[in-house]
């Protein structure tokens, strides 16, 4: 009687060992792919802001997008931001009819040494005239080539090759008394935001 129970017990233990040996071993060398973990949430957001050009006078504007105050405020609730598209538009005002203006502009990396006097001699630079008797019915748009510069304008580290806008404007006839600009620059695009944070940061 005792021998029979011992045999049953031994067989039961052998069955357990056999079943365990048939299971896929769990190890770092398993051929099975690891399951994908949860992805960080992202949010695609449009943005737009405007700044006027100097009124009645020759002038230049340098706009490094990553450190521009309006952009920094827009991104303050997220730790990471990546541009998906970026454009600049020269938008004339009613004043431009009597005060024409020529505008040169270009998108370059922030570390670029290109100056306002070199815009038209640099790849991508454009010149746009607004105002006078003939005015474009639609704003002229200059797009940034994000393949030639770093689209990550906010990250755990800072980069020196994020987009920078250079603008040089020249009135047809300078006017010291003019207080309203003949045109404004409108910067707009879309940015992919991730890693939201509770406390705003620049």
UniProtKB/Swiss-Prot annotation:
Q: Give the matching Gene3D superfamilies.
A: 2.60.120.20
Keywords attached to this Swiss-Prot or TrEMBL record, sorted alphabetically, are: Capsid protein, T=3 icosahedral capsid protein, Virion
GO cellular component terms, A-Z: T=3 icosahedral viral capsid
Q: Which GO terms describe its molecular function?
A: structural molecule activity
Primary location group: virion
The subcellular location is:
Virion
**InterPro entries from the entry?**
Tymo_coat, Viral_coat
Q: What's this chain's function?
A: Self-assembles to form a T=3 icosahedral capsid composed of 180 copies of the capsid protein. The capsid encapsulates the single-stranded RNA genome.
Family named by the database record: Belongs to the tymoviruses capsid protein family.
Q: What name appears for this protein in its UniProt entry?
A: Capsid protein
């Amino acid at each position: 009687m005792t021998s029979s129970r011992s045999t049953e017990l031994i067989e039961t233990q052998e069955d357990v060992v056999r079943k365990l040996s048939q299971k896929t071993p769990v190890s770092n060398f398993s051929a099975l792919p690891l399951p994908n973990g949860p992805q960080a949430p992202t949010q695609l957001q449009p943005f737009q802001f405007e700044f006027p050009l100097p009124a009645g006078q020759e002038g230049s504007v340098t706009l490094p997008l990553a450190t521009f105050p309006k952009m920094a405020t827009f991104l303050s609730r997220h730790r990471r931001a990546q541009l998906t598209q970026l454009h600049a538009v020269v938008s004339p005002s009613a004043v431009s009819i009597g005060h024409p203006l020529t505008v040169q502009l270009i998108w370059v990396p922030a570390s670029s040494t290109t100056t306002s006097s070199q815009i038209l001699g640099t790849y991508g630079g454009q010149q746009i005239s607004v105002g006078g008797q003939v005015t474009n019915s639609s704003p002229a748009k200059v797009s940034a080539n994000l393949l030639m510069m770093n689209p990550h304008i906010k990250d755990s580290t800072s980069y020196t090759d994020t987009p920078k806008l250079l603008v040089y404007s020249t009135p047809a006839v300078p006017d010291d008394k003019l207080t309203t600009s003949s045109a404004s620059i409108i910067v707009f695009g879309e940015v992919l935001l991730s890693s939201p944070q509770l406390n705003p940061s620049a």
